[in-house]
A protein has these predicted regions:
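Active-site neighborhoods and metal-handling regions in enzymes and metal-associated proteins
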Residues: 1-407
């Protein structure tokens, strides 16, 4: 915070599915709260009296929001509720010792309401500058980037859940009969992408996990568009690539895991095998070259080198590319599915984008040809940079392309 010249952090919103508040409080059933973290001082959590027990569980210094008489604040604001809330924030900041300087704002709120409140607060406190920070390198994300052993164990546990569910998915697909080149259910009706997704959500829920941002189960052309989640009505056809990218988190919005495999049911076409072999070669090469404190941009460049040598176009030569290597190599992972460190190209990288001890990140090279070949391929694992500099895949799972099915 001192380096960023911040007097305080102001975090608002629920604890669940709100990474800044979750990180500062440890989660819990807080449907709405505010937290002020002055530079060089302990944070203060402001809570609703209905959630006083949940607030107490955080172990933080707390303050009941009803101590600020909202009726009086509303009268002072002449009936303007937005201004009344801003007056309450003013009192909260002043009691926390924050009367001047830069205050960075975090959290999840309905933008329409909080925007008006912050505008009013800025007018009420002209010596305070309410600020945002560069998206990928905020103070909060920098703090979150290095994981301790407790955080690693939680991510590792989510990894075990993830690969268990992926294994169940493979078994589920393999257990089905085929008809006219596609999987069918026991009643003879086609199995669809939507059917598979419903099963995956159920398996996650049974393991106290969830996929709040969904996941990718995309077949054929959809597999060639990196973030296509797949079309629910699509049939599960043999010989078409399936990109299965699953990124669940702990129930209530805790730590994420991120994982991708590419499958082809029954058999793989020559085109699919060729693309898969190129991706796997690149994946294994890059994984074998990861080194402590190396710039992440080196590996983005290395991935471009490898794919270009195989004859594929990359975004290094064409930033508007839509076929070939059109995706970055990876990203950090934690309470967000995407966080620092970032695998950016050299012109966008910062000195913080390195493989530092305690980092958790994905490595996910892929090739995408939705229109010219009707397929795509990505392989992804989540890697922990251990304090001794070794790299650990937090949940191992086979890289096989072909999933056998019943005749």
């Amino acid at each position: 915070m001192q380096e960023a010249n911040l007097a305080a952090l102001l975090v608002t919103g629920p604890a669940a599915h709100n990474p800044p508040m979750y990180y500062m409080t440890g989660g819990g059933h807080l449907t709405h709260a505010d937290l002020i973290k002055p530079c060089g001082a302990d944070p203060i959590l402001f809570y609703s009296p209905m959630e006083r027990d949940e607030a107490a569980k955080t172990g933080l210094a707390t303050k009941n929001i009803v101590d600020y008489n909202f009726k009086e604040l509303l009268q002072q604001a002449e009936g303007d509720r937005i201004k009344a809330v801003a007056l309450r924030y003013q009192k909260m900041l002043e009691e926390a010792g924050v009367t001047a300087g830069r205050v960075s704002v975090y959290g999840k709120e309905e933008l329409n309401g909080i925007f008006g409140v912050l505008m009013q607060l800025q007018k009420l406190m002209p010596d305070v500058e309410l600020v945002g920070e560069p998206g990928g390198n905020s103070v909060m994300l920098q703090a979150m980037a290095t994981k301790d052993e407790h955080e690693i164990e939680r991510i590792r546990k989510m990894g075990k859940v993830t690969v268990e569910v992926v294994g169940l998915t493979a078994e589920f697909l393999s257990s089905h009969q085929t008809k006219n080149g596609a999987l069918v259910k026991a009643d003879g009706m086609p199995l669809t992408v939507g059917d598979v997704k419903r099963k995956v959500h159920l398996w996650l829920a049974e393991r106290d996990a969830e996929a709040p941002e969904g996941f990718i189960f995309a077949i054929g052309r959809d597999a060639g568009v990196p973030h296509s989640s797949g079309t629910d009505s699509d049939l599960i056809e043999l010989g078409k690539t399936i990109v299965y990218d699953i990124f669940p988190c702990e129930k209530g919005g805790g730590y994420y895991y991120d994982f991708t495999r590419t499958w082809s049911l029954g058999y793989a076409t020559d085109a699919a095998e060729s693309i898969y072999n190129d991706v796997r070669t690149t994946y294994e090469t890059v994984m074998g070259e990861l080194k402590l404190n190396a710039p992440t941009s080196d590996y983005q460049e290395r991935t471009c080198d490898l794919f270009e040598a195989q004859g594929h176009k990359t975004t290094r030569t064409d930033p508007a590319l839509q076929e070939g290597y059109v995706h970055s190599l990876g990203h950090g992972l934690g309470l967000h599915v995407h966080e620092a460190p970032w695998f950016r190209s050299k012109e966008y990288a910062t000195d913080k984008d390195i493989l530092f001890p305690g980092a958790v990140m994905t490595v996910e090279p892929g090739l995408y040809y939705p229109d010219s070949r009707g397929l795509g391929c990505r392989l992804e694992d989540t890697v922990y940079v251990r304090p001794d500099g070794t790299m650990e895949i937090l949940a191992e799972y086979p890289l096989d392309l072909v999933i056998p099915v019943k005749a």
